[in-house]
Amino acid sequence: MRAIIYLLLISAMVFSMTKAVPEEEGLQLSEDERGGCLPHNRFCNALSGPRCCSGLKCKELSIYDSRCLG
């Protein structure tokens, strides 16, 4: 009986997570993201990886967090 309840709970959680972001919204990319640059407040890596869009710089906020900021 417990196994059935757990299975139902897990199924409900997975279903709610997939419905949290509409499919069209999840698949849309902005012009800047398609071009390879990162928009404002996105995670970045100052040493490698995609660069921030024009006017933004990759700023290190902590040892584990760098973001594109103006």
UniProtKB/Swiss-Prot annotation:
It comes from the Eukaryota. SUPFAM superfamilies: omega toxin-like. Keywords: Amidation, Disulfide bond, Knottin, Neurotoxin, Secreted, Signal, Toxin. GO terms for molecular function: toxin activity. Expressed by the venom gland. Disulfide bonds join 37-53, 44-58, 52-68. GO terms for cellular component: extracellular region. Residues 21-34 form a propeptide. The presence of a 'disulfide through disulfide knot' structurally defines this protein as a knottin. This is U2-agatoxin-Ao1d. It comes from Agelena orientalis.
